[in-house]
């Protein structure tokens, strides 16, 4: 945990020093972020898959996860939060710890872990210049969860994200590896592979299907695989003001593998890009 906090402090300190060294950094914030967003495709962020695009928004998710005993766990916020574009080709995400209500008197409710994500856009072209994107992520979580609602150690997650559009159709995906900083053989590594396939039916209607897979190495689920098929629908972007918009939607996760911790899970998501 201390190592993760030190890394985060160093990143913030570096960004702050660089920022204040530039005249008009904050005065030019929206001009800079708008220019960054103009250089990439204008798809919407999928329901579950993290988009390779750079976004600047506030996001809230709500999840309902059903286990084999028929008990529903309510996940408030889903670990989402504030997304900013502080530099060209760079996005920083500060995620609020989710609050987890197990609806089970034998399991204590509480907040999950705090997490952060940095995106660096490697390649991109908007709809007039190829309609594609390739982005590298570095995510890390800090074990701030109460009781058993978080991990025992910090987890570092490098990820590669990609996307390509073909007219009104687009595909976005990520492949990442979650690596605990300690007790790796006991906790295990996770390999997550997510792909979303969207079709822009009309101006503000985006139906989609996602395939969300997790592969486990070491730990209690060694050798297992969990895959969900997630049909979803997104509506937006609706302009609330000259600067602020709104996109919302939801999805329904259906387990497609023999092993699955939950099934028939509901997801609601709302975002306010600015």
Task: Identify the function of each model-found stretch.
Residues 1-30:
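Cleavable N-terminal export/targeting peptides
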Residues 21-274:
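Transmembrane beta-barrel domains of Gram-negative outer membranes and organellar outer membranes
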């Amino acid at each position: 945990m201390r190592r993760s906090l030190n890394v985060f402090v160093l990143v913030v300190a570096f960004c702050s020093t660089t920022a204040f060294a530039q005249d008009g950094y904050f005065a030019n914030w929206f001009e800079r972020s708008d220019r960054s967003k103009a250089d990439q495709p204008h798809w919407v962020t999928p329901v579950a898959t993290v988009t390779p695009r750079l976004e600047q928004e506030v996001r809230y998710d709500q999840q309902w996860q059903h286990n084999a005993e028929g008990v529903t766990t309510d996940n408030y916020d889903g670990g989402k939060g504030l997304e900013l574009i502080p530099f060209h080709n760079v996005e920083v995400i500060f995620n609020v710890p989710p609050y987890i209500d197990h609806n089970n008197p034998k399991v204590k409710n509480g907040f999950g872990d705090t997490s952060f994500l940095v995106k660096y856009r490697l390649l991109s072209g908007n709809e007039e210049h190829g309609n594609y994107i390739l982005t590298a992520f570095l995510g890390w979580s800090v074990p701030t969860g109460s009781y058993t609602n978080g991990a025992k150690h910090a987890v570092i997650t490098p990820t590669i994200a990609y996307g390509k559009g073909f007219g009104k159709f687009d595909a976005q995906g990520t492949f990442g590896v979650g690596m605990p900083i300690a007790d790796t053989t006991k906790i295990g590594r996770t390999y997550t592979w997510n792909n979303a396939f969207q079709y822009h039916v009309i101006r503000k209607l985006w139906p989609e299907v996602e395939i969300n897979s997790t592969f486990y190495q070491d730990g209690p689920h060694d050798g297992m695989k969990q895959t969900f098929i997630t049909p979803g629908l997104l509506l937006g972007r609706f302009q609330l003001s000259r600067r602020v918009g709104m996109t919302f939607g939801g999805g329904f996760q259906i387990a497609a593998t023999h092993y699955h911790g939950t099934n028939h899970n509901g997801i609601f998501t709302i975002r306010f890009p600015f």
